Amino acid sequence: MKIGILCYPTYGGSGIVATELGMSLANKGYEVHFISSALPARLDITNPNIFFHRVNVQTYPLFQYQPYDIALSSMIYRVVNLYKLDLLHAHYAIPYAYAAFTAKQMLREDHNDIPLVTTLHGTDITLVGQHPSYKHAVEFSINQSDAITSVSESLKKDTLQFFNIKKEIQVITNFIDNSEFDDCSECQRTQFANPDEKILIHVSNLRPVKRVDEVLQIFKNVEKKVKSKLIIIGEGPDMEKVNQFLEENPDLISKIRLLGKVNDLYKILQLSDVFLLPSEQESFGLAALEAMAAYTPVISSNAGGIPEVNIQGETGYLAEIGNVEAMSNYTIKLLSNDELLAKMKKNAKEQAVKFDLKNILPIYEKMYRTTIENFKKELTKV
């Protein structure tokens, strides 16, 4: 099977899932073509079954904004024709599902029809998709897809609530390869904390929805009760809030490490005692799942799909969005009881195993085969 994957190249959840899915399929012998504006962050281009096609947008003075969607549709059309792809998989409704539909119409003129799968990841539905400028286009592109998947039950519910979707949405959760989180040979905790200190960690793109200011406040509250350090991994617009916090709290500067983007995230997660995720919205909570795979319990909000991953009182604790006091108290409770912490570390790993790649990949493979079969049946009716 030859599969075209359309995705963002960034470190965000949708890009990571799309890349890991494509590489896993390539490892099983599928031919996988990535179409994006840049090389996806985690993509191993040395795999002989992986192909990358960069979308280039030519600048032209007439356009206030360069027409990426048109260039994307043209590249999809070209790749499908050149490599005889069997299926397209768009990760994120805008612009990928919309551009893929346009490419499908072009291909139909050549009598080269191809099925399209669209995976909904979150802000394409909960934020971007609900804006009046995009809503109708998002709804249209989803309904024009031949199969639709969502990364959580919560996101499926939101999609059906906000849009008039005429097709079934199949929930296929995000996944991780647990084996990547089992090697701690290079983990050196003493690089970040003293033996008598606990380590809290937060990983995100530091957008406002991640509420990094609450991460900092939680740590400030916890540090008063438990000797601890905070590690923040990621870059984004709210880094200014972090810098402002440090200016206002100079006594905490030596207790907070800012690492930016890191490649071997699992090595840092395995050093940590608690993962903080007070997000305003999370369609699934992939960062929380990665933490659990590294034996790290999660203190989080109950936003979106997080409760489907983080189980209250078992793998960590959840609180209402914005309830910094509750999240602080839960963290103090957990870090003050080594027996409870050890139990939750074990529970977190067991929960992560349920979302292992080996369990989720066959679901995608079956969905692909079914989509292609159904698409061919529909073509014979025309």
Feature-to-residue mapping (PLM):
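A short helix/loop element that forms part of the nucleotide-sugar donor recognition site in Leloir-type
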Residues: 182-195, 247
